[in-house]
């Protein structure tokens, strides 16, 4: 298995925990803009690693995975600079749900419909007939 894909997978799991920590910190202590910005940038890094891994592996990926991930990144950056508690909690909580949905799209336990519709093979894939 591609090492970048493995890094993307495990790093993404860690990021879900970090996003949950941001939500809990915002709820109990108030928004921490430094932590919020760091987590948003870390998710950006994982997005880039995922894009590079996509072009280096022959694994089919559903289009829903990057769409949901990009929507989550947008919400993370919207909430990252905010000091408004409700905005931070809403943005980061919704981003967490979107990232879990993006994870479920390609996970073995995820819905089968996502694996059959809007699936894109990377350019490096070799299709055998």
Regions found by a protein language model. Give the residues of each.
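Polytopic transmembrane helical bundles with strong interfacial aromatic enrichment
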Residues: 1-129
């Amino acid at each position: 298995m591609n090492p970048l894909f493995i890094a993307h997978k495990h790093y993404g799991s860690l990021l879900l925990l970090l996003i949950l920590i941001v939500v809990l910190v915002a709820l109990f202590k108030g928004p921490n803009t430094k932590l919020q910005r760091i987590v948003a940038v870390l998710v950006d890094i994982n997005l880039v690693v995922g894009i590079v891994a996509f072009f280096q592996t022959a694994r089919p990926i559903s289009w829903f995975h990057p769409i949901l991930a990009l929507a989550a990144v947008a919400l993370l950056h919207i909430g990252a600079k905010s000091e408004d508690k409700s905005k931070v909690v809403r943005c980061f909580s919704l981003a967490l749900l979107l990232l879990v949905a993006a994870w479920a799209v390609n996970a073995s336990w995820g819905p089968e419909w996502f694996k059959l519709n809007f699936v894109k093979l990377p350019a490096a894939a070799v299709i055998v007939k």
